[in-house]
């Protein structure tokens, strides 16, 4: 939101700019809940996909994203705090018989981020902040194994499911500059977090030997993007403020995701590549 790295109006500044804790009272607690409802609709323009011909439903759905933050002053210039949130994730879910079910039926990514932080008021003009981020990611991906059935290989009637998770670390840093009694400038950076997900790829369909043949341990690597925020706030009078933000997110870090088998006769083979093309 506008001015997020410069406002420092409650404990959620731990996420946007930890240096902002030096603007808070001795102890502050902040909590919130964001409701997100994305929409993903597909329109077929004449593709041919074997026996899969069902229409696509809207893959979006409601998701609740909670957050909570606590900060407290150790002395007049040194503050510590901790934040808990869910910075990345959501769910896409189509009906099981839709036209593109060999590509995706359901994709569910959840993250939880715990962010202990510290802030130091260097002088009346400059404050600095630093935080560590422990992040857990859990992913589930469901699709049909293929678009057609063949003798002994009922691809279109078999579901392939990936379930994987990982814990990883990142960091964030920020600076707050009080230029005048009415004007502040904030700069913050959150690092990339690289997740090496490990889990299982399982098949579920009408022929047990085929289910076993496509099942294995699996892994995937996802590098969540880093972010920069530069914010400014200027108090015009007792009732009005001007706030502004320039932010950048390095989405190109998620170019593609290779799901690799790590056990069985096909160990080392790529089971599927998810091309994201984020820019």
Report each predicted region and the residues it spans.
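Transmembrane beta-strand segments of Gram-negative outer membrane beta-barrel proteins
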Residues: 1, 22-41
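Outer-membrane beta-barrel pore proteins
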Residues: 2-8, 14-27, 70-76, 122
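Outer-membrane beta-barrel porins/channels
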Residues: 4-5, 42-54, 62-279
């Amino acid at each position: 939101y506008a001015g997020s790295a410069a406002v420092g109006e409650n404990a959620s500044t731990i996420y946007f700019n930890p240096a902002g804790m030096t603007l808070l009272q001795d102890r502050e607690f902040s909590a919130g809940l964001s409701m997100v409802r994305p929409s993903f609709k597909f329109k077929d323009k004449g593709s041919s996909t074997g026996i899969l011909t069902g229409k696509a439903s809207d893959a979006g759905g409601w998701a609740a994203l909670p957050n909570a933050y606590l900060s407290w002053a150790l002395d007049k210039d040194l503050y510590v705090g901790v934040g808990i949130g869910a910075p990345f994730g959501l769910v896409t879910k189509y009906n099981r018989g839709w036209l593109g079910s060999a590509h995706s039926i359901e994709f569910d990514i959840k993250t939880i981020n715990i962010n202990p932080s510290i802030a130091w008021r260097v002088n009346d003009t400059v404050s600095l902040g630093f935080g560590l981020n422990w992040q857990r990611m859990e992913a589930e991906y469901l699709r049909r194994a293929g678009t057609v059935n063949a003798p002994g290989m009922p691809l279109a009637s078999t579901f392939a499911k990936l379930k994987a998770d990982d814990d990883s670390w990142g960091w964030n840093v920020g600076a707050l500059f009080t230029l005048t009694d009415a004007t502040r400038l904030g700069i913050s950076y959150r690092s990339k977090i690289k997740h090496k997900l490990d889990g299982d790829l399982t098949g579920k369909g009408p022929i047990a030997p085929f289910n076993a043949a496509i099942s294995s341990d699996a892994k995937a690597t996802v590098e969540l993007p880093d972010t920069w925020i530069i914010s400014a706030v200027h108090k015009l009078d007792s009732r009005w403020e001007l706030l502004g933000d320039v932010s950048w997110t390095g989405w190109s870090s998620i170019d593609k995701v290779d799901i690799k088998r790590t056990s069985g006769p096909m160990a080392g083979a790529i089971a599927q590549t998810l091309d994201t093309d984020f820019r």
